[in-house]
Every structure is written in C-alpha cells, then in structure tokens.
C-alpha cells in the first residue's frame, strides 16, 4: 500500500493473452500470410528447376542437326547464323565505301548471308525456306504462307517510282471546281488527302507519320479555331465520367437491340455489338436526370436574336397571324429584323421540320432507341459494302475501294433499300430534325451531345433568319446577301462532302476486320484534326478564298443573314472537327463505345446539315431576289457536287426539290394563316430586333494563308447556266441513270 494514494491499490497496465503465453516473443517476429508466401517464393527461386528439352525437339542420334529444329528456329527469329562471314566479291562491290552507315532498311544491297549458304537473317526468307521444307500436307503450311505474305507486304511497301525509292506516296489535292458537263460523277477529281491507299490493307500502326508535315507547317501554327468548344467538351467529358462512376449505377439495356437488316446473315449479333456497342448506348432511361439537364442546357443557350426557341415540343410556338413582313428594316443600324416576322418564322420552321416529327414520336410513344438504330443502320449500310468489311466472306475477289469521286457516292446506287427500321421514312423526311431530340443526344454520351447541340442551334438560327427576311414571292435580296448566300452554299456543300466521306471510312473502320489498315489512316490520325478543319486541306483553302474576299467582308458589315449563316458554319465546322478528333483519340486505345458515339454524332450533324441545305438552296432559283437585270450567281461545280452529295446521303435524309419546298412552305403558311408582305409593317408592329454579335463568327477565320498554290473554288457563273444540267434540283423530276443526275 502506498500512503500517497490513500491506501488505494496501483492499477497496472493490462497484458494481452498472447503476451502472457509468450512473454519473450518480439512483435516484429510475427509474419503475415503475405510474408510467408514471399519466403516460399524465395526458397523456390533458390532451387530453380532444370528445363528438360521436349522429346520431339531432340536431335536424332545419327544426325548432327535436325531439320525440324531449324524450321522452328527460323520462325522464332533466333537463328545463330553469322551475318558477316559471306565474302563474295559481288556483294562486297555493291556495298560501296559507306557500307554500314544509316538504317539497314535503306540500302539496296542484297541481304547478308550466313556461312555454308545459310538463310538470310530476315523473317521473309526464313518463312520462305520453312515453306519449302514443309510437305504440302503439313497442317500449319497455310499459316506460314499467310504470315509470309504479311511480312512481304510490310517489307516491300509500294512507293512512287518517279520520286525515288525513299519518297512517300504523293497525295492528290482536290479541287472544288466540279467536273466537265455531261461527264458524270466518275470524272470528278479524287478526294483531298487521299492517295493510292484507299484499298490498302497493309498494317499502319502510326497513322500520324503521314501527316507529320502539318506540324512543321508555319501557316498552320494555330490550328483550326475551335473557340471555347474544346474546354466545354473536356468539362462535359469529365463530368460524364464522374457521373458514371459515382452517381449512376450501370443499368441493363431497356430493350433488346436488334441487328441492322443490312447485316443480317453476314455477321453474328454478338460480333457486331462487340465492334459497334449500340446496346451499351441504349442503357440511358428516358426520364433520367441527364435528359433534364440536356433540355435545360438547350433552353439556356444564347441565340443571336435573344428569343427562346421551341425545339422539341408538341405545342406550336407563339406567333401573330396575318401579314408576315419579310425584309430588313431600313435605317442606319445594320443587322436588324422585324420581331413579328422572327416569331412567325419560328412557327413556320417548327411546322416544316421538328413539329411533325415530335408529334409522331409522342403519338406512337417511340423510344429514342429506334432513332439511334436508324442512324447506325443507315451509316453502316454504305460502309458494309466496302471490301474491308466483305473481304472475310469473299476471299480472293476483293475489289478496289472507291478512291475517286465523293466516297459514298461511288457506290450509292448499289444499295438504296438499306437497313430498314420502323419509322425510317419519318426520320428521313424531317429535314434532319433528329438532332433536336434531347433523349437521343443524351444517348450519344457527353461530348457528342454537346457538339450536336452546338451545331443544331447554329443551323436553326440561320434558317430562322432566312425565313424571316426573305420569301420567294417577296424576295428582296440585296447584292451583298446574294453573294454571301452563294459563298455559304459552296462552303456548306464542301463541308458536307467531307463529313459524308468521313462517315463512309469511319463506319468501315468500326465494322471491318482490319482496324489498323493504312486505308483508315484518314480517320485514325489525330494531327489533321488538330491543324485543319475536318482534317481537310481543301476545305481550309476554300475558307481562305471565301472569307478573305473583299466582297464577302462587305456583306458581313451590314447583313444579318450573312452574319448568322457565318455563325452556323463555324458551329457545324467546330463541332464536326471536334468529334472527328475525339474518334481518332479513342481509336488509338480502341474504345469502341466512345468511337461509336462520336461516329453517330457526326452522322446526326451530317443529316441536319443536308436537311438545312434545302431552304438555304432557295438561292438557286431566279425567283430568289432578282432586281432588274441582276441574276443570282453560284460557284462553278457547286450544284453538280450538291446533286451528287444528295444521292450519296439518300439513306440519311430525303432530298427535297425547290418546288416541293415552296409548296410545303406555302401550305404551312396557309394553315397558320400567314401572308408574306414585302412592305414594312404599320404602326404598332414596327418592333425590331438587332443581331447579337458573337465571338463564334466567321470573322474568326480571317487572316490565314492557303496551303495550295492554285485556287480550289471555281469562278462565279450564272445560276441558269448552272441549272442547265440539273433541272431536277428545281422540279424534282427526271432522275437520270448516273450519279448526281435525276
């Protein structure tokens, strides 16, 4: 007892049962299961087991070597033959004084041989000698033959003989001047950035090497102006990743996704969905919070006119019946439009496009999965005809891919009834309005949804100004507006050609058995989309020739129509380029889900662009604003290329002639009780709206240098002369047997 503690006993520290049992055991001496396993592995490593040779690889007792052993030795490339003991005067004379300098693949000297006439130290000769040594009935002889063909194609690639043995293949630059009258689509120059490798199945593991010169080109130091789209796309991609990881649990597909009919009987559904995982994209439920956020993002986006646009609704937007006062208000302020006419144009545009589609979808309770399957089936229908995809089923009868003309157009008459899905006629006949379906955009993941929303809003605003400012019965186009619309028609056609061609190649790349073939270098390389619009040097030069023109700059100064179409072009150009770059980035790591989403996003934008060219092509008629002896003009070859492009895009959108568009518009105006009036409105209806200038305008493309020495655009020609070969663009009658002529 301690007196200081008032007689209370001292509390000692409690000891564990382990310490009581083993009082002298150190805690550090305890070993876990992992330590025990490591110790066992270390003991096994100290006693390595001697590898015994296989009995079938043993050398026969009466021979010094075994021929079977040599065969497998050559296949593995482990031959111990020397490479410097063959001293023939012929080979020594060909070596020259600089023998040994540089890469061994750059010399033209024959391969060095091993002593005693052995095989050269290269895989090709080793495979050939192995094939010679094997009997015809050997089970693996066919495997060696296929491997030898692959090695031969890799070691001896085709080159341009006129430019030297080390010169790369020269790529043809494309001109947008069109082709001679009466020659058809077959005489059109080849697409830009494409050489003789359109059907090249050689493996190309580094596709950016062919475009390395673009990084060294000082004229492309800044690359294509993507403005704020890159940052927005990066933020959307990060947000979607976080949502998938922490917010939304993975769900099973809502419905069973069928195989497109164009591929039935040619590929198993499991194999198709492994390459194009549409079932993974169909997992988003219709009432998901992401759909609500997508709808809110559309409603909160700014517009050039400042009004809220009704996109996906079964209710007509508000408007005033009566006179529709088309034409710009006269005054000192530029870029004005009547507010009454703008709201009437919203109702007119809604009825012409998205209104009928939205009501049909709502009435039939159609899920967005059908629209997704429609896009995939129609885009894959053309690509399924490529030799890259059908080579597995038709070995030995491989025909060359279309390396000339407009890509898709080279085989457009081969498949017109492609991949039928329910309501396909409705989707094709809505002027590309699928892009305004919020649930469909959400299915395409974050970045494609953002790009589709951006491009769709730009094209919608441009059409609104076109319908609000002009009418065929009261056109009133000024000279500046006619020139600007002609320039935009040329640029939009060139952009649509490039987008459709990309869809053609990207679909074959997704579905084909050779994803690393040189033929798909265009869609796999990342450098072109970092430096050029849509990865096209021809489109870059066409933009430079158009935007830097003094007449075009004068039109931008005062015309609201020229400004809003410029913003629409920049929006489509930026969104499409970003999606193509996304596809190339995901193709490098073979992320097929994101590749499919980017592919369908480009298809959605291309469908909307082709549908928007119909009202924009009102310029093609003599009724579109002739004042006195003046007549609209258009670039030579533009209408011919547009006609060819309309045939190529038949699976996605149904082309509409001018007469058909006028009749549909006039019928809708009668239903809405609207009447076009060329005079200014009376007092009380004279409220005007001014176009809000944006940083995403066509002026951001000013000040660049062309890449080619020759112009890519043709001269301006009379619209009547250009329509001489294509009267079906106005009347819709007289479809011809050749591509682009009806």
UniProtKB/Swiss-Prot annotation:
Instruction: Cite a single Pfam family from the UniProt record.
Output: Herpes_UL47
PTM comment: the record says:
Phosphorylated by US3. This phosphorylation is required for proper nuclear localization.
Motif span (Nuclear localization signal)? 10-30
Q: What is its main location?
A: virion
Q: Where is the composition biased (Basic and acidic residues)?
A: 1-10, 38-62
Q: Where is this motif: Nuclear export signal?
A: 95-122, 485-495
Which InterPro entries does this one have?
Herpes_UL47
Query: Compositional bias (Low complexity) at which positions?
Result: 18-37
Signal peptide residues are none
Q: Does the keyword Cytoplasm apply?
A: no
Can you quote a single GO CC term?
host cell nucleoplasm
> Which keywords belong to this entry?
Host cytoplasm, Host nucleus, Late protein, Transcription, Transcription regulation, Virion, Virion tegument
Which residues lie within the region annotated Disordered? 1-128, 155-199
Q: Where is the composition biased (Acidic residues)?
A: 63-88
Its domain of life reads Viruses
**Which compartment or compartments is the protein found in?**
Virion tegument; Host nucleus; Host cytoplasm
The entry describes its oligomerization and partners as: Interacts with US3 kinase. Interacts with UL31 and UL34; these interactions seem important for efficient virion nuclear egress. Interacts with UL41/VHS.
Q: What else is known?
A: Expressed in late in the infection.
Q: Could you tell me what this protein does? A: Tegument protein that can bind to various RNA transcripts. Plays a role in the attenuation of selective viral and cellular mRNA degradation by modulating the activity of host shutoff RNase UL41/VHS. Also plays a role in the primary envelopment of virions in the perinuclear space, probably by interacting with two nuclear egress proteins UL31 and UL34.
What family name appears in the similarity comment? Answer: Belongs to the alphaherpesvirinae HHV-1 UL47 family.
Name listed for the protein in its UniProt record: Tegument protein UL47
- Organism field: Bovine herpesvirus 1.1 (strain P8-2) (BoHV-1)
């Amino acid at each position: 007892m301690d007196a200081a503690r008032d007689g209370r006993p001292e509390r000692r520290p409690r000891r564990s049962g382990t310490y009581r049992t083993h009082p002298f055991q150190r805690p550090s001496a305890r070993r876990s299961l992992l330590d025990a396993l490591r110790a066992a592995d270390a003991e096994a490593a100290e006693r390595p087991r001697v590898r015994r040779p296989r009995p079938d690889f043993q050398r026969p007792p009466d021979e010094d070597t075994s021929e079977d052993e040599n065969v497998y030795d050559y296949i593995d490339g482990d031959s111990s033959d020397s490479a410097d003991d063959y001293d023939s005067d012929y080979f020594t004379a060909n070596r020259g004084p600089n023998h040994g300098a540089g890469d061994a693949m750059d010399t033209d000297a024959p391969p060095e041989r091993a002593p005693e006439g052995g095989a050269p130290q290269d895989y090709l000769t080793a495979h050939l000698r192995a094939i010679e040594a094997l009997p015809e009935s050997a089970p693996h002889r066919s495997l060696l033959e296929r491997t030898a063909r692959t090695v031969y194609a890799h070691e001896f690639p085709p080159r341009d003989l006129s430019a030297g043995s080390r010169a790369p293949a020269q790529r043809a630059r494309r001109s947008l001047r069109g082709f001679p009258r009466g020659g058809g689509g077959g005489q059109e120059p080849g697409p830009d950035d494409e050489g003789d490798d359109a059907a090249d199945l050689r493996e190309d593991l580094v596709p950016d090497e062919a475009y390395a010169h673009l990084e060294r080109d000082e004229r492309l130091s800044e690359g294509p102006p993507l403005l704020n789209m890159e940052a927005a796309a990066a933020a959307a991609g990060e947000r979607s990743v976080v949502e998938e990881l922490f917010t939304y649990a993975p769900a099973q597909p809502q419905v069973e996704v069928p195989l497109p009919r164009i591929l039935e009987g040619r590929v198993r559904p499991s194999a198709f969905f492994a390459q194009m995982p549409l079932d993974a994209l169909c997992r988003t439920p219709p009432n998901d919070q992401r759909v609500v956020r997508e709808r809110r993002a559309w409603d909160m986006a700014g517009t050039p006119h400042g009004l809220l646009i009704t996109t996906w609704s079964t209710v007509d937007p508000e408007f005033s019946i009566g006179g529709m006062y088309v034409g710009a208000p006269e005054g000192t302020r530029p870029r004005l439009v009547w507010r009454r006419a703008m709201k009437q144009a919203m109702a007119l545009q809604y009825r012409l496009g998205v209104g009928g589609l939205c009501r049909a979808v709502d009435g039939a309770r159609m899920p967005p999965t059908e629209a997704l399957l429609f896009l995939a089936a129609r885009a894959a229908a053309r690509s399924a005809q490529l030799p890259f995809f059908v080579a597995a089923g038709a070995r030995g009868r491989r025909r060359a891919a279309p390396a000339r003309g407009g890509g898709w157009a080279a085989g457009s008459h081969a498949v017109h009834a492609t991949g039928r899905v329910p309501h396909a006629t409705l989707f094709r006949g809505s002027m590309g309005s699928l892009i305004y379906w919020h649930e469909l955009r959400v299915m395409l993941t974050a970045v494609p949804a953002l790009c589709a929303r951006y491009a769709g809003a730009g094209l919608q605003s441009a059409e609104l100004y076109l319908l609000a400012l002009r009418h065929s019965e009261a056109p009133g186009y000024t000279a500046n507006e006619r020139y600007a619309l002609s320039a935009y028609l040329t640029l939009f056609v060139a952009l649509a050609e490039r987008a459709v061609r990309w869809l053609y190649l990207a679909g074959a790349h997704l579905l084909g058995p050779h994803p690393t073939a040189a033929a798909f270098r265009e869609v796999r390389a990342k450098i072109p989309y970092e430096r050029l619009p849509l990865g096209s040097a021809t489109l870059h030069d066409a933009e430079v020739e158009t935007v830097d023109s003094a007449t075009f700059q004068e039109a931008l100064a005062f015309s609201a129509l020229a400004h809003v179409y410029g913003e629409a072009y920049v929006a489509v150009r930026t969104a499409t380029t970003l999606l193509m770059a996304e596809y190339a980035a995901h193709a490098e790591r073979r992320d097929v889900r994101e590749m499919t989403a980017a592919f369908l996003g480009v298809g959605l934008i291309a469908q909307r662009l082709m549908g928007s060219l119909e009202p924009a092509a009102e310029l093609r008629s003599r009724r579109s604003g002739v004042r006195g002896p003046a007549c609209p003009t258009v670039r030579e070859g533009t209408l011919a290329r547009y006609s060819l492009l309309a045939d190529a895009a038949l699976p996605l959108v149904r082309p509409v002639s001018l007469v058909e568009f006028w009749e549909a518009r006039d019928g809708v105006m009668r239903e809405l009780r609207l009447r076009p009036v060329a005079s200014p409105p009376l007092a009380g209806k004279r409220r005007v709206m001014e176009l809000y200038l944006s940083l995403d305008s066509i002026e951001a493309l000013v000040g660049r240098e062309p890449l080619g020495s020759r112009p890519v655009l043709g001269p301006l020609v009379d619209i009547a002369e250009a329509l001489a070969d294509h009267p079906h663009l106005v009347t819709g009658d007289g479809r011809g047997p050749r591509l682009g002529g009806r």
